[in-house]
């Protein structure tokens, strides 16, 4: 069957073509049965991995030096295990990207990226040349599709033009690490970070001291 079609708002042009014998009529109503077919939408950035602890300027007066004690801790704040294969970690201090291998971060667990993995058993070797700035840097975690999963810009001072901008100070060579207070809240706010109560070096690979039910202090 040869059909000629003329557009409603057009000149004298005609469109010529053939009917497909398998064509079906358009139906404006559709029904679906999830028992037969269903899909589940997942946002491409739904991975709930957060930068949870940063030891960017270890305290040399405690015998902890940058090349041996710098680390970044990631926390899986979701309910599913996540394979980090092909994920990237960027650090503006050195302006390069670290690529993760076939590493699975279980739900509710921690992963340490260490400048010296011998200091932290079970950690990932970040490389001795990949230092963390002692003053300010932007840390970015991207998934295999290069989408940003988490990003933090830490500082050792205050930005008068930004709310919640004063970063904790004892993590700047005072013996504490920089610990996230609430992984469900925006971790790019300085107000969501606190100096670790554990001195020196914080709590790499375990629950943050700021989130612990234990009470830290000294007896009189």
Predicted segments with their positions:
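Primarily marks secretory-pathway-exposed extracellular/lumenal segments that are disulfide-
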Residues: 1-50, 196-220
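Activation on beta-sandwich/Ig-like modules and their edge loops
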Residues: 10, 42-189, 196-199, 213-214
């Amino acid at each position: 069957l040869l059909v000629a079609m003329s557009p409603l708002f057009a000149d004298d042009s005609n469109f010529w073509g053939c009917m497909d014998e398998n064509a079906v009529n358009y139906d404006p109503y559709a029904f679906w049965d999830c028992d037969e077919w269903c899909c589940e939408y997942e946002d491409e950035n739904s991975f709930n991995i957060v930068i949870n602890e940063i030891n960017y300027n270890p305290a040399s007066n405690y015998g902890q030096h940058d090349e041996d004690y710098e680390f970044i801790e990631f926390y899986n704040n979701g309910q599913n295990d996540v394979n980090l294969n092909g994920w990237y970690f960027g650090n503006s201090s050195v302006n390069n990207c670290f690529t993760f291998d076939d590493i699975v971060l279980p739900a509710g667990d921690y992963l340490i990226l260490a400048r010296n993995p011998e200091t932290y058993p079970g950690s990932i070797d970040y490389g001795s040349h990949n230092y963390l700035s002692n003053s300010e840097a932007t840390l970015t975690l991207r998934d295999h599709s290069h989408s940003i999963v988490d990003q933090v810009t830490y500082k050792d001072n205050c930005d008068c033009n930004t709310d919640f901008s004063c970063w904790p100070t004892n993590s700047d060579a005072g013996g504490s690490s920089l610990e996230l207070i609430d992984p469900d809240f925006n971790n790019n706010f300085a107000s969501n970070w606190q100096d670790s109560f554990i001195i020196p070096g914080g709590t790499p690979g375990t629950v943050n001291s700021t989130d612990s039910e234990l009470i830290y202090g000294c007896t009189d």
